[in-house]
């Protein structure tokens, strides 16, 4: 069975299963929901089975490789494969998408299209992390944008058209640089088009060309991650999207930028990365503090959490720029950790809005009396976000801290400066998160709740189940981080072996 096309099955199963949904009766909401949830769960179980039985965790090379001709005259192949870098993010995709599907249970408007788009997005994201061909990588990068665009445009809030336009302009504009860079790398040095990552990694480019390619790819990933100053689409998008879509955006979409930065910029363009690494660290440090300060000034709950996400992505940049095993391990762990925590916070923001019908913090207050379970969960995940010891965020941020401190690439003064800025960001994080909790749950009673009993307003079994599923891996990773670090540790060492610091 090792020769079975497992990865092709994993990539195509959701979208092919989604093609059946249009044949369901339009009023069969429950049937569509359960069918989609069943497909997501089956996909996640299949991913887990394949990785447990066929993936060698101590081997840094690409495994489960598949290569099929797709478009002969372009030498365009369907090339798939996984390694330690992709396995954690594919598992995260399966886990978050399954829970986001369950979170979307209240959606009743045009459910057939909604759940088809959820499954199409699932395939696009898994396909991107499994791609071993740079043109296929670009194809999956673009394919994933279409479901997000429609989910935001149709099921978004009042300003959804503005947010959708901004989202597509930023992301599609950045994608052009991936296509241009991919074709340049593919044609360079030969009339034969070379697109697979393995052959591209063996190519040598003039330093000037490598720098230009690096900057082009970096712009695309800076939009997606996002990196200051190309981040402004994210708060608008999160502010208008349905909370199940927000879970996918925060949990998976942002991680595509970090993945591309490691997979292409670090692995394929190591000389340019060595030059730009100090700038990446500097931007990451500035982003942590800048986004934290902006987050504190936000009145809108979802926008505050969105800026919190931008701040936390600064740690990913510092870890990538540190060029140490510890720092890069921390960066990847931060992507996984934030995927879980960010998805939980946006889900909590969504179910809070369902009850209060407002996202403005200054219009809330005293809701802990009416929503004690939501209050408990919101407090727990906020503690995880501010990197409380014993939770995954603490381990990730500590590794990034340690990575920059032990790096031999930077001077003592530079490391001290970056560490101080990081520390300021870590101090600001509890300020805006605890302030958020105070405004939401403490103080005067929320007047709109006076006619409801506590049991009517608090989280139900479905919502509690989603939150418990998210808190378990956050605490588990925090207490035993090696359970996930072992997935990509050998790959991190392999990537950094290309650099001489």
Swiss-Prot record:
Q: What is the lineage of its organism?
A: Eukaryota, Viridiplantae, Streptophyta, Embryophyta, Bryophyta
Q: Which PANTHER family match?
A: NAD(P)H-QUINONE OXIDOREDUCTASE CHAIN 4, CHLOROPLASTIC, NADH-UBIQUINONE OXIDOREDUCTASE CHAIN 4
Against NCBIfam families, the record matches this protein to: NDH_I_M, PRK12561.1
Reaction(s) catalysed by this chain, per the record, are: a plastoquinone + NADH + (n+1) H(+)(in) = a plastoquinol + NAD(+) + n H(+)(out); a plastoquinone + NADPH + (n+1) H(+)(in) = a plastoquinol + NADP(+) + n H(+)(out)
EC main class here is translocase
Example GO BP:
electron transport coupled proton transport
Question: Its Enzyme Commission number?
Answer: 7.1.1.-
Organism whose genome encodes this protein: Physcomitrium patens (Spreading-leaved earth moss)
Q: Which domain of life is it from?
A: Eukaryota
Q: Name one GO cellular component term.
A: chloroplast thylakoid membrane
Name of the featured protein: NAD(P)H-quinone oxidoreductase chain 4, chloroplastic
Which keywords, in A-to-Z order, does the entry hold?
Chloroplast, Membrane, NAD, NADP, Plastid, Plastoquinone, Quinone, Thylakoid, Translocase, Transmembrane, Transmembrane helix
Main localization, broad class: plastid
Residue stretches spanning the membrane: 4-24, 35-55, 87-107, 113-133, 134-154, 167-187, 211-231, 242-262, 274-294, 310-330, 331-351, 386-406, 416-436, 464-484
According to Swiss-Prot or TrEMBL, what is its membrane topology?
Answer: Multi-pass membrane protein
């Amino acid at each position: 069975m090792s020769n079975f096309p497992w990865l092709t099955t994993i990539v195509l199963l959701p979208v092919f299963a989604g093609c059946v949904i249009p044949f369901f009766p339009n009023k069969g909401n429950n049937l569509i929901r359960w069918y989609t949830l069943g497909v997501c769960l089956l996909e996640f179980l299949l991913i887990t089975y394949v990785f447990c039985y066929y993936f060698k965790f101590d081997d840094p090379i690409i495994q489960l490789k598949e290569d099929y001709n797709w478009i002969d005259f372009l030498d365009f192949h369907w090339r798939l494969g996984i390694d330690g870098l992709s396995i954690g993010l594919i598992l995260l995709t399966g886990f978050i998408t399954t829970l986001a599907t369950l979170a979307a249970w209240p959606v009743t408007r045009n459910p057939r299209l909604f759940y088809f788009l959820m499954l199409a997005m699932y395939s696009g994201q898994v396909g991107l992390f499994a791609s071993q061909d740079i043109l296929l990588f670009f194809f999956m990068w673009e394919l994933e944008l279409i479901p997000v665009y429609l989910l935001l445009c149709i099921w978004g809030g009042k300003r959804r058209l503005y947010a959708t336009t901004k989202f597509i302009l930023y992301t599609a504009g950045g994608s052009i640089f991936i296509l241009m860079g991919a074709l340049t790398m593919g044609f360079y040095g030969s009339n034969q088009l070379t697109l697979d990552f393995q052959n591209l990694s063996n190519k040598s480019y003039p330093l000037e060309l490598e720098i230009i390619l690096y900057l082009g790819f970096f712009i695309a990933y800076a939009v997606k991650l996002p990196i200051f100053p190309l981040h402004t689409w994210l708060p608008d998008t999160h502010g208008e999207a349905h909370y199940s879509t927000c879970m996918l955006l925060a949990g998976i979409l942002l991680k595509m930028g970090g993945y591309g930065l490691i997979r292409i910029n670090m692995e394929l363009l190591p000389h340019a990365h060595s030059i730009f690494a100090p700038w990446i660290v500097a931007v990451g440090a500035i982003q942590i503090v800048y986004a934290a300060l902006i987050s504190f000034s936000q009145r809108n709950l979802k926008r505050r959490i969105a800026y919190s996400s931008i701040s936390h992505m600064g740690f990913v940049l510092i870890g990538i720029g540190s060029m140490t095993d510890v720092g890069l391990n921390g960066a990847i762990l931060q992507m996984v950790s934030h995927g879980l925590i960010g998805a939980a916070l946006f889900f909590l923001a969504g179910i809070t809005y369902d009850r209060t019908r407002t996202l403005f913090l200054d219009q809330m207050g005293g809701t802990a009396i009416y929503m004690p379970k939501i209050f408990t969960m919101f407090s727990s995940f906020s503690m995880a976000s501010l990197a409380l010891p014993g939770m995954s965020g603490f381990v990730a941020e500590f590794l990034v801290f340690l990575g920059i401190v032990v790096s031999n690439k930077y001077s003592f003064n530079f490391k001290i400066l970056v560490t101080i800025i990081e520390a300021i960001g870590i101090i600001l994080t509890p300020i805006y998160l605890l302030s958020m909790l105070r405004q939401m749950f403490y103080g005067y009673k929320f007047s709109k709740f006076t006619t409801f009993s506590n049991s009517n307003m608090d989280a139900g079994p479905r919502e509690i189940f989603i939150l418990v599923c998210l808190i378990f891996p956050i605490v588990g990773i925090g207490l035993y981080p090696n359970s996930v670090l072992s997935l990509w540790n050998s790959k991190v060492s392999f990537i950094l072996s290309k650099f001489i610091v």
